[in-house]
């Protein structure tokens, strides 16, 4: 595919005016300056959507935090109950780690130390 010099010059002669015509249309001059306050309908709608999403996730975050706090309180109470059970004057009291309860060795019933 040899392109002769005359074909290259002809192609260049054709493409150069086309490129110049396109470049002049691209660089149009304007004398107007548009200043937006940032308070457009689109930005208000976007802010409303973000607020709605935040509120939805806030409810979910509250549920997760309550569950975490509840589990923490349960573990904390079990730790305190274990200490009370182990320090109990009742010699038949023992701590059951699987159920997190203080049980009587003879009956297997829950006791309060």
Curated annotation (Swiss-Prot):
InterPro entries: DUF1283
Keywords, alphabetical: Signal
Highest taxon above the source species: Bacteria
Signal peptide boundaries: 1-28
Family listed: Belongs to the UPF0482 family.
HAMAP family xrefs: UPF0482 (MF_01581)
Protein name: UPF0482 protein YnfB
